[in-house]
Regions:
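The feature captures the catalytic groove of carbohydrate-active enzymes
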Residues: 90, 95-101, 146-173, 188, ...
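Glycine-rich, acidic and aromatic/proline-enriched surface loops and short helix-turn segments
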Residues: 74-85, 121, 130-137, 174, ...
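Active-site core of glycosidic bond-cleaving carbohydrate-active enzymes
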Residues: 101-137, 193-204, 244-263, 275, ...
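Active-site acid/base region of carbohydrate-active enzymes
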Residues: 55-74, 131-144, 181-244, 272-279, ...
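Low-complexity, Ser/Thr/Pro/Gly-enriched N-terminal "stalk/linker" regions
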Residues: 19, 39-103, 126, 283, ...
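Glycine- and aromatic-rich loop/turn segments at beta-sheet edges
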Residues: 82-98, 136-159, 208-236, 285-307, ...
């Protein structure tokens, strides 16, 4: 138990106690007190005000790797150039084809993490709020796929409430992104009535409106045209009944909604949607697995049959997004999917035609490789996105996801599902001796992180209250050290199957802590 000072209120003590229980529960998932401690900590922290908004564009990156430094400088400058305040919608950033003066559901969802690192979190919230506010029964519980700077549906996509363009994964994608933004920002606005209504309608009424055979999956029927497309691969709108990216996004939304309801102490709803998520994962890893070809099917076609890859050379719906959303089963099936994705990356890099399937699909690759510990492929995919010769490099999603991949992938920074707890997990390759990311906004804190290879990490709590730092390293090590002393460490497998050694370190405001692995 931590000592109580004169400045420490009873509420602070309760929060610290709950935080300790939660962190212990995270390291020992079997603890029966895990759910209780997490709910208690969320309730105690829900009313805490944030200590000011993040400063836009404050983030800085330094490294021994010149390629990464130059790529970061370009991506930061390019991304901030898309941050705008014109129009009537308030602060926003372009997240669509340049020149459309608009932002699209899929793009914002994928760009939101990079935007957070850039200090643009309040803009993301404003944009997400517009999507949430415009969900309606008249549109079969869709919202506006693309919104202009004047808070109107983009005319290229929308005629009226009965004739508009819509990709069915989008509702789920936005819900998942809102949950992740809530973790990053701890902004209680993401739990206001407008957002909660959107979340609830998405996982209930939206599913019922588009699930025509009542099997729990949404379908695109032949007469739908551009309404209710069952995949993000829009070239296949008339060929796919259910895309694997659709079921993957639905799974992610159910997981996000489960966490949101658990945080609100709505445990019955949390249990219901956790069960629904588990059912989708079981269904996908059973019926959607093609044992003969050792890969997942990409879609159910309009003919009612499973298909591996309906579009030669792309196949984005086949494997990328199920991996991205964590739908694939840990072990051989996930490894098979990653192997296919690595082959596609190499084909992409060697193709005289440039990016096969577009930069949109390519922009997910660094996320995925780093997520599953394939740092070598992650580095190749990330630096390819930075390449000045990349076709359509000016597409907004490219620069934003480069920033996000540097932060969450290479640097391994992420907020954990309980407040004031941050994780780092370095994934540097031999090209990068050291790397540092400064002025990163996370919740009520601003932090800096530096990795020396994958053996030493320092974290500075630049501003904000004391925090718990989960310092994790790839591999299994004999011990971890801090301040010249061995510290308690846990060796385990991450949820994605990568071996790790980790420890929890408390970092006060203005303090820098260093953790390193034992040599030898």
């Amino acid at each position: 138990m931590m000592a109580v000072t004169n400045e420490c209120s009873r509420r602070d003590v309760l929060k610290a106690t709950a935080a300790s229980l939660v962190v212990a529960g995270y390291l020992c998932k079997g603890s029966s007190g895990w759910g209780y401690a997490q709910s208690a900590f969320h309730r105690l922290t829900a009313q805490d005000a944030r200590e000011g908004e993040p400063q836009e564009g404050a983030i800085e990156f330094a490294s021994s790797d010149v390629k990464l430094v130059e790529g970061f400088r370009w991506a930061k400058s390019q991304a901030l150039a898309y941050a705008r305040t014109d129009g009537t919608i308030g602060p926003w950033y372009e997240a669509s084809l340049p020149g459309r003066d608009a932002f699209c559901m899929r793009d914002v969802s994928h760009m939101s993490t990079g935007a957070q690192f850039l200090g643009l979190g309040p803009r993301t919230k404003n944009m997400m709020h517009r999507f949430a506010a415009n969900i309606s029964a008249a549109k079969k519980w869709c919202t506006w796929w693309e919104i202009t700077r004047d808070n109107l549906p983009a005319p290229v996509d929308y005629n009226n409430d009965h004739d508009f363009w819509y990709d069915l994964p989008a509702n789920f994608d936005v819900l998942d992104a809102c949950y992740r933004q809530w973790l990053w920002t701890r902004d209680s606005d993401y739990l206001d009535q407008v957002f909660l209504n959107y979340y609830r309608h998405t996982v209930t009424d939206y599913v019922q409106a588009w699930d025509h055979d009542h099997d729990g999956l949404l379908e695109h029927l032949p007469n739908f045209g551009h309404m209710g497309i069952a995949t993000y691969d829009e070239d296949l709108q008339d060929e796919i009944l259910v895309g694997s990216d659709l079921i993957a996004a639905q799974y992610a939304a159910y997981r996000g909604y489960t966490a949101i309801e658990r945080a609100r102490n709505e445990l019955k709803a949390a249990a219901e949607f956790e069960q629904k998520a588990d059912h989708l994962k079981s269904l996908y890893n059973g019926k959607w697995w093609d044992a003969a070809r050792n890969c997942y099917f990409g879609a159910i076609g309009e003919d009612g049959k499973f298909h591996a890859d309906l579009k030669e050379g792309d196949g984005r719906c086949a494997v990328e997004l199920p991996l991205y959303y964590g739908l694939t089963a840990a072990g051989p099936k996930t490894h098979a999917g990653l192997d296919i994705l690595e082959q596609r990356l190499q084909s992409d890099l060697n193709s005289p035609r440039g990016v096969i399937g577009g930069v949109e699909g390519r922009s997910y690759m660094p996320d995925i490789f780093y997520m599953y510990g394939r740092s070598r492929a992650g580095y190749s995919a990330l630096t390819a996105m930075m390449d000045p010769g990349l076709q359509r490099r000016e597409y907004p999603e490219v620069s934003y996801t480069v920033i996000g991949n540097l932060g969450t992938g290479l640097m391994g920074i992420r907020p954990l599902p309980f407040e004031q707890t941050i994780e780092t997990f370095p994934q540097l390759t031999e090209e990068t001796g050291w790397a540092a990311l400064h002025h990163v906004p996370v919740g009520r804190n601003v932090i800096s992180v530096k990795h020396v290879k994958n053996n030493e990490t320092s974290l500075t709590n630049e501003n904000g209250p004391g925090l718990a730092w989960r310092a994790a390293f790839p591999g299994k090590f004999r011990a971890l050290f801090s301040r010249g002393k061995e510290i308690p460490a846990t060796r385990a497998l991450r949820s994605t199957g990568t071996a790790e050694t980790c420890s929890i370190v408390h970092v006060e405001r203005g303090e820098t802590r260093v953790v390193r692995v034992a040599s030898g």
